[in-house]
């Protein structure tokens, strides 16, 4: 029984998104009932009828899920002591900051992906993920999108590469700035100097500096949050690197300021020992790298690849050890949350005295950072909100775009607790998402 538990939970559940898997399971029923794998493509009327019926049933299911989310949101807003039906079906369901027009989003994606016309391949994880992205895009454009935050690697540029001047994502980001939407790049890269971030983002920063249709205020509407939530840089046209560091005293939230340096050091010491044990026990070709606000393992020699399973094992081991210690907190969301109120990072609600951390798989390394992206996005919300109206940009007015949303070893996951999110799988998908947003904004204006 113990072995089965470990296999089913420790090695599988952390690689799934329970909400997406649940929706995918709902859509599997009409696929089985209405698909015609025994037909032939020459049988036009039969295939057309099948697609129409499957489309109708898929749309009905998405509408039913949409209504369940509405009920979940109403109970969030009322702080109801009784769980919603959605929460009973999916205990991990987090806060929703906006309605999700899933029926409309499905119809939109069905026109692009022809989900209803497929006879051999059921609606997939990626189909549902794209439907949710479209629904969230529709929701934030129906409201007022004020802040868009982005991960770096795999979101804005390929893993290990830089944001070059030829990148198609750059004109889309400039378009957001023209629309007076603030941009925060919230990356795990923990550089302490501006020149390293300029090296990674020079294509975008140079494009902003050279732009003739962005006013000075719009050019200042971008910040870089490095090391998850540890280093803030603002745009500076007079700097050779186009960035200037912002002292922590100017942007730390009161909760973040309460984390003592001694506790941070002790947490990183425990994490370093756990990482060292993993390197020895798994015989990893890796070495320890210690920074002032992070510790991790990287390959001993460039070009060496570490097995994905070994990286995941390391993340789960280190995370568990830190959670069991008296120092670290990796809570995923607050126990109470009103989506209409300023977002509260997850560890505040229950363990404000413990230091939040994020253990994540970087693709070929593992790092433990102080804080996580919920705090990084929160800093962006407060930084821009305080300049506009003295408050914080709300979760329903924030969209975080990233590629790592699985529940363990993924550092975008925590951002779900402080704003709306879009889950992409490549820079090309980011471009597609931004085009989708721009199109929806244009339709709203017209």
Swiss-Prot record:
Binding locations of Mg(2+): 151, 153, 403
Enzyme class: hydrolase
Documented activity regulation: Allosterically activated by ATP. ATP binding is a prerequisite to magnesium and substrate binding. ATP binds to 2 of the subunits in the homotetramer inducing a closure of these 2 subunits and the release of the C-terminal loop, thereby activating the enzyme.
A single GO BP: nicotinamide riboside biosynthetic process
Gene Ontology molecular function terms on file: ATP binding; IMP 5'-nucleotidase activity; magnesium ion binding
SUPFAM superfamilies for this protein: HAD-like
Enzymatic reactions: IMP + H2O = inosine + phosphate
Listed cofactors: Mg(2+)
Residue numbers spanned by region Disordered: 328-350
Database matches in InterPro entries: HAD-like_sf, ISN1
Complex and partners: Homotetramer.
Name of the protein in question: IMP-specific 5'-nucleotidase 1
Organism, scientific name: Gibberella zeae (strain ATCC MYA-4620 / CBS 123657 / FGSC 9075 / NRRL 31084 / PH-1)
Lineage: Eukaryota, Fungi, Dikarya, Ascomycota, Pezizomycotina
């Amino acid at each position: 029984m113990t072995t089965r538990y470990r296999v089913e939970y420790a090695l599988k559940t952390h690689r799934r998104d329970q909400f997406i898997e649940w929706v995918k399971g709902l859509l599997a029923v009409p696929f089985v009932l209405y698909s015609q794998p025994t037909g032939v493509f020459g049988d036009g009327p039969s295939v057309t009828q099948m697609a129409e019926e499957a489309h109708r049933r898929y749309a009905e299911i998405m509408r039913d899920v949409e209504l369940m989310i509405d009920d979940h949101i109403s109970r969030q807003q009322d702080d109801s002591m009784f769980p919603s039906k959605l929460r009973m079906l999916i205990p991990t369901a987090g806060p929703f900051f906006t309605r999700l027009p899933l029926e409309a989003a499905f119809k939109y994606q069905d026109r692009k992906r022809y989900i209803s016309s497929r006879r051999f391949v059921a609606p997939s994880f990626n189909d549902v993920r794209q439907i949710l992205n479209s629904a969230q895009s529709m929701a934030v454009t129906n409201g007022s999108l004020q802040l868009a935050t982005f991960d770096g690697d795999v979101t804005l540029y390929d893993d290990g590469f830089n944001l070059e001047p030829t990148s198609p994502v750059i004109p889309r980001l400039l378009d957001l700035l023209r629309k007076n939407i603030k941009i925060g790049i919230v990356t795990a890269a923990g550089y302490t100097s501006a020149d390293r971030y300029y090296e990674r983002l020079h294509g975008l920063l140079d494009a902003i500096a050279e732009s003739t249709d962005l006013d000075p205020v719009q050019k200042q509407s971008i910040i870089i949050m490095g090391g998850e939530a540890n280093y803030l840089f603002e745009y500076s046209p007079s700097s050779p690197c186009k960035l200037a560091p912002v002292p922590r005293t100017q942007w730390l939230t009161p909760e973040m300021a309460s984390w003592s340096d001694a506790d941070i050091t002790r947490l990183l010491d425990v994490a370093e020992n756990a990482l060292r044990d993993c390197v020895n026990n798994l015989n990893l070709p890796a070495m320890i790298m210690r920074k002032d606000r992070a510790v991790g393992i990287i390959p001993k020699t460039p070009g060496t690849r570490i097995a994905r399973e070994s990286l995941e094992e390391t993340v789960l081991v280190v995370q568990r050890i830190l959670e069991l210690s008296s120092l670290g907190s990796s809570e995923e969301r607050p126990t109470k949350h009103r989506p209409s109120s300023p977002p509260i990072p997850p560890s505040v609600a229950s363990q404000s005295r413990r230091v939040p951390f994020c253990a994540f798989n970087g693709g070929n390394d593992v790092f433990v950072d102080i804080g996580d992206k919920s705090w990084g996005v929160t800093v962006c919300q407060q930084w821009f909100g305080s300049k506009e109206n003295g408050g914080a940009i709300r979760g329903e007015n924030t969209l975080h775009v990233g590629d790592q949303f699985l529940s363990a070893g993924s550092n975008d996951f925590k951002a779900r607790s402080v704003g709306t999110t879009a889950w992409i799988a490549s820079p090309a998908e980011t471009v597609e998402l931004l085009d989708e947003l721009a199109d929806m904004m244009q339709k709203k204006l017209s």
